[in-house]
Amino acid sequence: MANEGTKEKLDIELEAPADFTSPEVLYQDLINTIRKYHPSDDITMIEKAYRIADEAHKEQKRKSGEPYIIHPLCVAIILADLEMDKETIAAGLLHDVVEDTIMTLEQLTKEFGSEVSFLVDGVTKLTQLNWDKDKVEIQADNLRKMFLAMAKDIRVIIIKLADRLHNMRTGQYWKPEKQKKCPKWIILPGKR
């Protein structure tokens, strides 16, 4: 937060990085959630996706100061809460590795196959949309791209929505200018 007035205006208390749930605890929550609806499902793909995402994002931090891996884990937990398949959850864990790390789409395809890499690539392409502009033609183009992605595989949109949901849940760490563009209820601290 830029100043104390902004903090009071939003009526929130910022957490110290030490207060965040550890990645290990979140990972165990993810596995437990998956086991509830797929008790016999082979989760080696999800375990591998977590290891690769954790390594790829190892040096990165979020604006809050927490390890970056917490974001993909929370996205994956949202997807697991929706009882998505293991390919979708793996793609949720990996959704930022091509965009934000040195990992390439080809490497991702080699490690996880074409289905997971297709989902990650689709989310990456949706990320390139202009979400914050008000111009009608940009909005129409964004909708066109989203409808095309939905026609190919609705899971791309579901992963992107889980990504946006987690980003909104951590909106208290956005710059004040960005916070002003969103309704107050979006950026209040809440469930991860």
List each model region and its residues.
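Active-site helical microenvironments for divalent-metal-assisted chemistry
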Residues: 1-192
